[in-house]
């Protein structure tokens, strides 16, 4: 989500909340708008990446109550590969430490992984396969067509000590074979909501001039062929994914506000 092409502002966050959106996750642009940063403690439905420094404002994950009364955990993660406005801690180390805490509260865990690197998001998917309900990639602004259900892979060589998970808090041992029955929904990038005929929401003409001349040009917004993109994920009663389906809804031109 962006306000004026640079991070989400407080007013737009509140507007989205009133429209019925339960949770907003933020990537490396989460601290771009001062009014949102100052009010993050009062806006718990807006999440900043969980692998930021300990004293960062806001929360990196939160529990929500579903319509059927179940508890759902949403986690925001920021990658480290490529160009990012924020310097995050290692997301793999963070998730390894955080998951046992969340799992004691609920098996329903959905994570948003904001990264510009496809390989980083795919690697995280294999790392978390069978351990969370869904991993939804974001950050590139372009939807991918690789949605799938993933499960943990067993090491059949007999030397797979890394595939045995020991919870010291509950004194339970879980092998990856037990995790195989649980599926994780995954997509490398769910896309964006905005102009489909654009360069990441920016007018193509300006971006063409920028690439041809090498001179930065402040991006101009465009409202051509506005679409809502995302994924529809169905979970079972144990926190596993049953299905994941890409969503793209084109908004009629008459319903789209035009820039002044």
Enumerate the predicted regions with their spans.
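Acidic, metal/ion-coordinating pockets
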Residues: 1-260
């Amino acid at each position: 989500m962006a306000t004026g092409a640079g991070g989400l502002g407080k007013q737009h966050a509140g507007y989205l909340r009133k429209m019925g959106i339960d949770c907003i996750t933020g990537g490396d642009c989460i601290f771009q708008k001062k009014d949102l940063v100052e009010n993050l403690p009062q806006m718990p439905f807006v999440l900043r990446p969980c692998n930021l420094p300990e004293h960062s404002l806001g929360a990196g994950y939160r529990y929500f109550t579903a319509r059927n009364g179940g508890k759902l955990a949403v986690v925001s993660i920021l990658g480290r590969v490529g160009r990012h406005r924020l310097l995050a801690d290692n997301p793999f180390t963070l998730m390894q430490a955080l998951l046992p805490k969340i799992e004691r509260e609920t098996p329903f865990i959905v994570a948003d992984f904001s990264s510009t690197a496809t390989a980083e998001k795919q690697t995280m998917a294999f790392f978390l396969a069978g351990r969370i309900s869904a991993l939804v990639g974001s950050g590139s602004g372009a939807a991918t067509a690789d949605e799938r259900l993933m499960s943990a892979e067993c090491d059949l060589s007999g030397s797979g000590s890394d595939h045995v998970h020991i919870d010291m808090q509950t004194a339970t041992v879980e092998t990856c074979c037990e995790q195989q029955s649980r599926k994780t929904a995954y997509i490398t990038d769910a896309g964006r909501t905005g102009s489909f005929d654009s360069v990441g929401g920016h007018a193509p003409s300006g971006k063409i001039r920028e690439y041809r001349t090498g001179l930065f040009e402040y991006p101009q917004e465009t409202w051509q062929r506005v679409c809502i993109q995302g994924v529809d994920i169905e979970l079972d009663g144990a926190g596993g994914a049953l299905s994941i389906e890409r969503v793209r809804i084109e908004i009629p031109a008459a319903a789209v506000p035009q820039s002044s």
